[in-house]
Every structure is written in C-alpha cells, then in structure tokens.
C-alpha cells in the first residue's frame, strides 16, 4: 500500500523544530496489516484521538482527572503510530483548552500534538472550532461584554478565533467546524452566548470563516445522533440544519457521526437492526443525497450493561461493532474512521456512566495491558469487507 504524496508531506507548522517522538521505520500506519493499512487498501483511512493530558474534558461531570498523562505513555504512542494514519486532538483545540481569556490563545498542548503528527507522518483532523453549547465554552464567555452591538461583536470574536486557529494549522485536512449544536430532545439549535447575540446564522458565519481560513480543508458538522430510541427528533433536527446550510450555499462538506455506540453509550441504547437499521439508513441516505460525505469521528463502545465476563463482553462488543461498521462502510462517501482512543484505560467512558458491578469498561480496540481485543479484529474485518472507494485526498 502506497501513501499519497500529499500524505507524506502532511507536516505541521512546527515540524521543523520537532524531534521524532516515537522510533519508526516509515510513515505511521503504513504496515499492510495495520488498521490504517487495511483501510487504505479500500481507499479509506483509520485514525484516533490523542491527548496530552488525562482523557476527558476538564469541566465534564464525573471526570476524576487521576489517570496518567496518556502522551507520556510510549507504549500507547507506539500502538498509535503502528495502527493509525490520522490524528485528531482529543481536547487540545477546544475553546476551553486554548482560550484562557478573550484576547489570548494558548497553543502549547496543541502544538505538541502537531509536532508528534509531523514527526510520524500522520494526517491531522481538527476538533473543534465551535462547540456551540455554553457548558463546553470557557467560563469567561458567559460574562463577556458584547457591547452595544452584540451581534457584530460576537461575529468578530468568533471569526477571529476561527481564523487564528485554522490559519495556525494549515496542515489540518478536515475540521469539525461546529460540534453538537442540535438539542437531542427538541431538534432545535442549542442556546449559547453566540446564538443569543447573533441567532442561528452563527453556524453559517462559522463555516464561512473556516472556509476563508482553510480553503482546501474538509468542513464538517459533527454530532451524536443515532438510530436509538427517541433519536428521531435529533436526526430530524440535524437534517434540517444540513438542508438549510446547503440551501444557503454555506460551505459544508461532510457530516461527522460520533458513533459512541453500545448499550452503555451516550448516543444509542438499542441495537442497529430491524426498524432501527431502516431508520438509520434512511437518515444516511438523506445526508448522502445532500452531496455530503459521512465520517465516523469518535468511535467507541459503551458496554455498561453487557456481561461481567470479559471474554463474553468483548465478543458481544465485537459482533455489534462489526455489524455497525458493515452498515456504515456500505456508504462509499464515508472515507475514514476515527476511534475515540486506542487503549481502554485512557477512554473518557471510564468516567462516564459506570457499570453497576463496578467493573471497568472495555470500550476501545486495545485493553489495559496493550493487547488487541476482538474489537480490533472486528474493525479490521470490516475494512477487509468494505467496498473500495476513492480516498478523499487522491
């Protein structure tokens, strides 16, 4: 499997000063039997998030913050470089990570990840330029004085942020421009400091600003709608948003499907079969009909209600995940898959919705001892079975 010249040259702005952080013989994820290698054989790519600190958002309820710094884990990074061709910063590009106040930016953690990606030949996704929910914005935004012309000032603040971040990292080939702006229970746009000042057009402004700052990047709306019970309202709300953006010639290229799946996930609590699968495929068909690509952006598996026995649990996770990937990969406008972590112990799900029996969740392709699990083989098998397609950057 040969990597494209563009991928080989996907270097960060800070690459010149970066030293290789993991010993490697070639560009990351090029081994034919790696997950990225198997994906690339079908015109796909595979990657994962990686963080520079304890996994999980610092303001998220229940996050303990006591796990080891994953970026200091050389075994994790070795697995990452072997298996992945794409890196997305877990939290390091979010407003709360880089905006200590209204005038300053702190890119130290993000720069570290960009240097790692450059040193190892990894493509980079960006997540996220606007998480349009107040709970995930830095506290100072709630008391910010937007002055006598709040709409104008809010637009300035937002566009300055997007232009500053996106222009700093021109190597990012795909940006989550807006994240989770549709309320699952109502299907309407979440209220935020920006929607209060500007209205729903804040989303349009964000995408136009992203296109101006990153003219060649794939621009994405990212959300966690699913086939699950009661999710029709969420799906319909996302579709209405996408339809409006396309109608208004807003520069959007793809829908990111977060894919936190499983009976203990935040997105879906029932199985992808029967009427659920019909409804989900209908949604994906409608997204495809808008001319948009589809991306799996944050895959993991919540196993909180599955059997206690690890072998039985892992087998159930693998079987369910294999079917999910088979459904998703049947769409040729889906060109890459991102996991939300590679090693169980660094998953944000370890701190979210714990199992009643107290056992630790096993949501990712590798276990706490850095050994591949049946989930890893399920993903590999899905790539082997996937129809071929043209890679996004060809």
Residue ranges and their predicted role:
Residues 176, 181-182, 186, 191-197, ...:
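Aromatic-rich peripheral "rim/lid" segments of glycoside hydrolase catalytic domains that contact
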Residues 39-40, 74-84, 112-120, 166-170, ...:
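Acidic (Asp/Glu)-rich catalytic clusters
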Residues 86-100, 109-226, 303:
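Substrate-binding cleft and catalytic face of glycoside hydrolase catalytic domains
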Residues 1-19:
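N-terminal secretory signal peptides and thylakoid transit peptides that target proteins
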Residues 22-49, 394:
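C-terminal segment of N-terminal export signals and the immediately downstream linker at the start
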Residues 46-48, 89, 124-126, 219-221, ...:
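Hydrophobic faces of well-ordered beta-strands that scaffold small-molecule active sites
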Residues 197-205, 214, 218, 235-240, ...:
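Glycoside hydrolase catalytic-domain groove-lining segments
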Residues 64-81, 158-164, 233-244, 321-324:
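Short, acidic/polar
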């Amino acid at each position: 499997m040969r990597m494209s010249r563009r991928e080989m040259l996907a270097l960060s702005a800070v690459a010149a000063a970066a030293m290789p952080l993991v010993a490697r013989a070639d560009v990351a994820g090029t081994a034919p039997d790696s997950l990225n290698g198997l994906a690339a054989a079908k015109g796909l790519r595979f990657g994962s998030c990686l963080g520079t600190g304890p996994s999980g958002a610092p303001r998220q309820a229940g996050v303990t913050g006591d796990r080891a710094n994953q970026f200091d884990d050389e075994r994790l990074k070795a697995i990452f470089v072997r298996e992945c061709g794409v890196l997305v910063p877990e939290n390091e590009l979010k407003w709360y990570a880089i905006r200590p106040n209204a005038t300053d930016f702190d890119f130290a953690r993000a720069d570290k990840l960009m240097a790692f990606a450059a040193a190892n030949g990894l493509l980079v996704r960006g997540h996220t330029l606007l998480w349009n929910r107040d709970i995930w914005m830095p506290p100072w935004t709630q008391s910010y004085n937007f002055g006598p012309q709040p709409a104008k000032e809010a637009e300035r603040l937002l566009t300055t942020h997007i232009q500053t971040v996106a222009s700093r990292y021109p190597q990012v080939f795909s940006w989550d421009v807006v994240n989770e702006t549709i309320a699952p229970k109502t299907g309407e746009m979440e209220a935020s400091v920006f929607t209060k000042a500007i209205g729903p057009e804040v989303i349009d402004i964000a995408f136009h600003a992203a296109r101006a700052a990153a003219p060649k990047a794939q621009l994405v709306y990212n959300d966690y709608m699913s086939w699950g019970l009661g999710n029709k309202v969420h799906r319909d709300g996302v579709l209405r948003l996408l339809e409006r953006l396309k109608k208004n010639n807003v520069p959007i290229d793809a829908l990111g499907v977060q894919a936190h799946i499983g009976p203990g996930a935040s997105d879906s609590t029932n199985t992808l079969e029967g009427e659920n699968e019909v409804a989900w495929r209908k949604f994906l068909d409608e997204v495809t009909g808008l001319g948009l690509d589809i991306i799996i952006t944050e895959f993991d598996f919540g196993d909180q209600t599955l059997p206690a026995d690890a072998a039985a649990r892992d087998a159930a996770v693998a079987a369910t995940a294999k079917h999910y990937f088979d459904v998703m990969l049947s769409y040729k406008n889906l060109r890459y898959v991102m996991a939300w972590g590679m090693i169980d112990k660094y998953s944000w799900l370890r701190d979210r919705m714990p199992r009643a029996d107290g056992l630790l969740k096993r949501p990712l392709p590798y276990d706490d001892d850095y050994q591949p699990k049946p989930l890893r083989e399920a993903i590999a098998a899905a790539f082997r079975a996937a129809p071929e397609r043209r890679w996004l950057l060809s």
